[in-house]
């Protein structure tokens, strides 16, 4: 009843995605298969994406109060071409890590797509995918793993493209989860 199918471009070790088959079964049991599904604390939105891609939900609503995560999901669903261009053109280096960390952490002038890409870059190059964690391999890059160890651009790009194809079936929010649930 658990899944290891991964559809999210973000990495969240220990995330909710493996529970998608269980949620699908609950939806089926309650006669709501094919309806809308809300993931109030989206993060990587693994459950929502799995349900959408396997036809258990016709529309998913992903919500995350974190402005960085929200920017990422808006970039994927509304500006995927720009996001993919950044993904393709940005080298995975420690210099770029510092650049994107600055964009993510500081109140600097950056577009929503740049903020979204900074989220992706940090998620893929930081320990355990934690946005505020340190870089994989350390700043001197002398660890057993290097910062690109979890950043397979081709896999990430493929996932972004698949999600972008379903953009009309995905709504993205940055709201308080309880208020959103009470709408």
What are these regions (language model features)?
Residues 2-27, 32, 76-183:
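SAM-dependent nucleic-acid methyltransferase catalytic core
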């Amino acid at each position: 009843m658990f899944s290891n199918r991964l559809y999210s471009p973000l990495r969240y070790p220990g995330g909710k995605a493996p529970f998608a088959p269980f949620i699908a079964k609950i939806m089926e049991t309650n006669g709501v298969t094919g309806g809308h599904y809300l993931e109030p604390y989206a993060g990587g939105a693994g459950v929502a994406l799995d349900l959408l891609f396997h036809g258990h939900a016709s529309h998913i609503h992903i919500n995350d109060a974190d402005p960085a995560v929200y920017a990422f999901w808006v970039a994927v669903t509304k500006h995927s071409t720009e996001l993919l261009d950044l993904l393709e053109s940005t080298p995975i280096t420690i210099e770029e890590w510092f650049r994107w960390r600055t964009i993510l952490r500081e109140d600097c002038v950056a577009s929503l797509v740049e903020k979204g890409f900074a989220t992706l870059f940090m998620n893929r190059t930081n320990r355990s995918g934690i946005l505020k964690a340190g870089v994989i391999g350390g700043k001197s890059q002398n660890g057993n793993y290097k910062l690109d160890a979890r950043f397979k651009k081709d896999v990430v790009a493929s996932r972004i493209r698949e999600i972008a194809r379903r953009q009309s079936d995905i709504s993205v929010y940055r709201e308080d989860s309880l208020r959103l649930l009470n709408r």
